[in-house]
């Protein structure tokens, strides 16, 4: 299975450039075109958070306008720049999010691999953290018998990357 990952798109309302100089909308449009034209075909796309730069609902709508051009199905999880409330509103029509509660989590078995999208965000904090409730959900999900390989995707790395300014924002309890 060919799977593509998009992350940290940092889309802003009104298609504004991020950080005063980065045209994230054009970059995402280019990525979508590349994925659609890639051969052999990409079978699914995972988007691992920081979809927006400031969490605004309008920015999520701009993201949707662009990402809806993807040919393969796509799956999203939030990052620390995303408002959970606006995330849920923007993606309420996504069937795989229908059972999410206070955090965004789901398992999709529609592909040759099982995809588990997992929310590691802490509202208004740069780092990630796994609550007991989230860990229990993940344990139960992983305990379900399947013959498929499982791919877990989330925003925060569960280990140090060696990039100092990023490692202070990683998953605090990633060893769990």
Stretches with model-predicted labels:
Residues 57-144, 149, 171-176:
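Extended active-site neighborhood of metal-dependent phosphoesterases/phosphodiesterases
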Residues 145-162:
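Short acidic, glycine-rich surface-loop motifs adjacent to enzyme active sites
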Residues 12, 19, 94-95, 160:
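Class I (Rossmann-like) S-adenosyl-L-methionine-dependent methyltransferase catalytic domain
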Residues 17, 51, 121-132, 159-168:
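Surface-exposed cleft-lining segments at the edges of enzyme active sites
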Residues 1-62:
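N-terminal active-site segment of His-dependent metallophosphoesterases
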Residues 9-11, 82-83, 121-123, 157-159:
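Short, solvent-exposed loop/turn segments at secondary-structure junctions
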Residues 8, 49-50, 79, 118, ...:
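Active-site glycine-centered loops adjacent to acidic/histidine catalytic or metal-binding residues
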Residues 3, 45, 115, 150-151:
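Hydrophobic beta-strand anchors of alpha/beta hydrolase catalytic cores
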